Amino acid sequence: MSIVQTPAKRMTGGELGLILVFAALGFFSIVVAAKAYTPEYAFHAYLFAAASIATVFVIGNRYMDRPAELPPQTIDGKPNYNMAPVKVGTLLAVFWGIAGFLIGVIIALQMAYPLFNFDLPWISFGRLRPLHTSAVIFAFGGNVLIATSFYVVQRTSHARLAGYLAPWFVVLGYNFFIVIAGTGYLLGITQGKEYAEPEWYADLWLTIVWVTYFLVFLGTVLKRKEPHIYVANWFYLAFILTIAVLHLGNNAAIPVSVFSPKSYIVWSGVQDAMVQWWYGHNAVGFFLTAGFLALMYYFIPKRADKPVYSYRLSIVHFWALIFLYIWAGPHHLHYTALPDWAQTLGMTFSIMLWMPSWGGMINGLMTLSGAWDKLRTDPIIRMMVVAVAFYGMATFEGPMMSVKSVNSLSHYTEWGIGHVHSGALGWVAYISFGAIYCLIPWLWNKREMYSMKAIEWHFWVSTLGIVLYICAMWVAGILQGLMWRAYTALGFLEYSFIETVEAMHPLYVIRAIGGILFLAGSLIMAWNVFMTITRAETVSQPSGAALAPAE
């Protein structure tokens, strides 16, 4: 009689290392909380301590429950994909999306009806506005990018995600950063830098998470079984790497003390403004553009069951975008103390960006060649194609607004808000919704979303909301700009500032209505996601196959 010996279970170096690191972090956080200069900072230190202690217990419990052998890279010769972090990231994206849209509706109502501030500092416009932008960009958008990148890189590489605990650290660590940043805004902890409000300790935590994200993604690409690196992975890598550089450069700061939330940025004056908008514009360029173009290059061909229209054009699109986008930041600082040559440089590169941007748009739209009927029959395809159309519109409007003569009218007005939201709602949100509608059935092995009719409703309700929103802001912005520059025959300003504010009121109300409709659409999506996971018909095999590279 033969005896089969099972290998002895041993804790991996990663498990042991993380337990020790988080135990030390928990102890250090308790010390910081006890000596913190402010109660708000002490609250954050206690959050770090609680999260660290919980992580130690979770890793220990996971070790006790797992078999001696770590999950294999392949099963019966097929890749053993690690989709659990992708599932969590996708659901968190839905949650944060609704939260961010809800906060946006609240601050839109505050703009139209200031009584909605309720004289409470924690929910005043000044604190909710950065909470809204961070929730929709970094919480919703960031989770979409992390989840889809982990899915796409595995499928196109035919390889399991690199690392055992590292993918979980990326997903959960990133969302812990969102919690720290968001609660910090409500408590008044901020650097005062747009899109980079979190203070030094949150930035430091995000740096650790982001480096891990880069290593997991790159490690998966390096161990790929496919000789070809699919173009979507190029865009993901550019987004991850460039955001890391931008984050480090713009958040270079010296803390007052380890016991204080306050820090001082190493840049000052006009140099600080330039670095801020080098970061701010390229957060748009690489977080909200390059990252989501990766979604376009994977999910539209997958859903349409067609290859990318021109793979060569996608490579040209990639390199042109990467080279040009990084120079366009100064167009945010027209008519300021920034040297005129730098303003002109930013304007020039912004105009040049129009061509590669539209090259990508054409590539995305023409991928549907031979499958245009799906625009009528498939609301998910329709949503993603409309997203690409909004991308084209926003990338024409942006270069146009960067021209100094146009910018003299549009700068500091609601036109800029309309432009941002045509890209954020029309491009980023719609391509994200399309990706989520694709991912949910694939991840949970469902035949299709629970209700295609609900997706139709989501599309039309949200589209009406977007149209109301951006049209109201376009009209408001142009009206604002014209009223500000209107003079009487004697050379006096024709309108007082309060008159320009009063003229905005009906347009602010329309914006709030548009936001409510967009939020309603996202709630329909959340219901559909829940019903798909719990009620929809299950299939025996996962329906999302790897995407073969197009030629």
From Swiss-Prot:
Keywords: Cell membrane, Copper, Electron transport, Heme, Iron, Membrane, Metal-binding, Respiratory chain, Translocase, Transmembrane, Transmembrane helix, Transport. Its EC number is 7.1.1.9. It is found in: Cell membrane. Its cofactor is Cu(2+); heme b. Heme b 1; low-spin binds at residues 132, 421. The chain crosses the membrane at residues 14-34, 40-60, 88-108, 133-153, 169-189, 202-222, 229-249, 280-300, 313-333, 345-365, 383-403, 424-444, 459-479, 513-533. It holds the Pfam family COX1. Pathway: Energy metabolism; oxidative phosphorylation. The keyword Chloroplast does not apply. CDD domains: cbb3_Oxidase_I. One of its GO terms (cellular component) is plasma membrane. Gene3D superfamilies: Cytochrome c oxidase-like, subunit I domain. Belongs to the heme-copper respiratory oxidase family. Cytochrome c oxidase is the component of the respiratory chain that catalyzes the reduction of oxygen to water. Subunits 1-3 form the functional core of the enzyme complex. Co I is the catalytic subunit of the enzyme. Electrons originating in cytochrome c or a quinol are transferred to the bimetallic center formed by a high-spin heme and copper B. This is Cytochrome c oxidase subunit 1 homolog.
